[in-house]
Amino acid sequence: MIESTLPALALWGVIGYLLGSIPFGMVLAKVMGLGNLRDIGSGNIGATNVLRTGNKLAAALTLVLDGGKGVVAVLAARAAGGEDLAQIAGLMAMIGHCYPVWLRFAGGKGVATFLGIVLALAFPVGVGCCLAWLAGAFATRISSMGALVASVAAVPLAFLLGFPGAVVLLILLGALIFWRHRGNIARIRTGTEPKIGQKK
């Protein structure tokens, strides 16, 4: 097992970032002949925008694979050296998804990757966040609202369910979710945010 030394933290930070940087939405859209996601809907590379192509399978695969990046980063780092490495790998996987080197640092909004990270880091909290996402999204039919609700719910859920050690990371991840959704928040306020399944 690798101890949580600075070199180990740096190594798993890089591994997490590179995992997070894999643009599964872009790859699937190209392989499945759906076009360039940058020219579709919001131009985002995540599952919500893939759904705007009309291909539900591609959207579901994007959701699972983007979430899987977070799961793999956290579990692999934990197996190598414990919770410190798991948290840094998870944080960097999120940053990699949002700012991937392969796409000139213009990536997705991190919702699926966030949920994957939390599920792997603290499973009960992750389940609660998934339920919060579903509640927010289906109550409003706005995907971004579900993301915001889930990110806000994460910290109190961590305290309630006995995972206080994850709180700092969850605050950082939540702040990144809000930052990446700042345009969505502005549209929610003006009532112009697209509904789930609606072309932007």
UniProtKB/Swiss-Prot annotation:
Probably interacts with PlsX. It comes from the Bacteria. Keywords: Cell inner membrane, Cell membrane, Lipid biosynthesis, Lipid metabolism, Membrane, Phospholipid biosynthesis, Phospholipid metabolism, Transferase, Transmembrane, Transmembrane helix. Its EC number is 2.3.1.275. It catalyses: an acyl phosphate + sn-glycerol 3-phosphate = a 1-acyl-sn-glycero-3-phosphate + phosphate. Pathway: Lipid metabolism; phospholipid metabolism. Catalyzes the transfer of an acyl group from acyl-phosphate (acyl-PO(4)) to glycerol-3-phosphate (G3P) to form lysophosphatidic acid (LPA). This enzyme utilizes acyl-phosphate as fatty acyl donor, but not acyl-CoA or acyl-ACP. It is a multi-pass membrane protein. SMART domains: G3P_acyltransf. GO terms for biological process: phospholipid biosynthetic process. Belongs to the PlsY family. It comes from Roseobacter denitrificans (strain ATCC 33942 / OCh 114) (Erythrobacter sp. (strain OCh 114)). GO terms for molecular function: acyl-phosphate glycerol-3-phosphate acyltransferase activity. HAMAP family: PlsY. Pfam families: G3P_acyltransf. The chain crosses the membrane at residues 8-28, 57-77, 88-108, 114-134, 159-179. Its main location: membrane. This is Glycerol-3-phosphate acyltransferase. Disulfide bonds: none annotated.
